[in-house]
Amino acid sequence: MPKFKDVYAVLPVSEHSAAVAWYERWIGRRPDTEPMEGVAEWLIAGNAGIQVAHSPEAAGKSAVVIVVEDIDDTVGSLGARGVECGAIQDYDFIKLTEVADPAGNKVTFVWENPNYRPSTADD
């Protein structure tokens, strides 16, 4: 089995500059690297990152799920930066909210309930 080192979610965009500005706003910093023209990368957790890539033909057709420590704090922090999330959806085992980037790619923020216990046949 291969030993994986890093994971990047690639989000294709049609307007690279606008997308980079939008991601800078909610991530709170400039890209960590711009390895080539039309590509910007942010390391957002451990060895996981987001890559915004200029690719107009694929723009708006991707999605990424980001697990957060506090969904309410995340929504509040993003709102303070001008990034409005959808309503928080509560499914007992998770809470989530979604937002679309300027290209239409879906970014879903998820909080996992550490106290959730699924019902069993014995319940």
Where are these regions (language model features)?
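N-terminal beta-strand motif that seeds the catalytic metal site of vicinal oxygen chelate
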Residues: M1-V20, S62-V64, N113-D123
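Core segments of cupin and vicinal oxygen chelate
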Residues: K3-D6, V10-G49
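Vicinal oxygen chelate
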Residues: H16, V64-K106, W111-R117
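A short linear hydrophobic-aromatic micro-motif
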Residues: R30, I50-V52, E84-A87
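Conserved catalytic-core motifs of GNAT/GCN5-like acyltransferases
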Residues: R30-M36, Q89, P114-Y116, T120
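Short acidic/glycine-enriched loop/turn segments that link adjacent beta-strands
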Residues: M36-V39, A58-G60, Y91-K95
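Short, charged/polar surface micro-motifs in flexible loops or helix N-caps
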Residues: G46-G49, E57-G60, D70-D73
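Short, charged/polar, Gly/Pro-enriched secondary-structure boundary elements
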Residues: N47-Q51, G104-V107
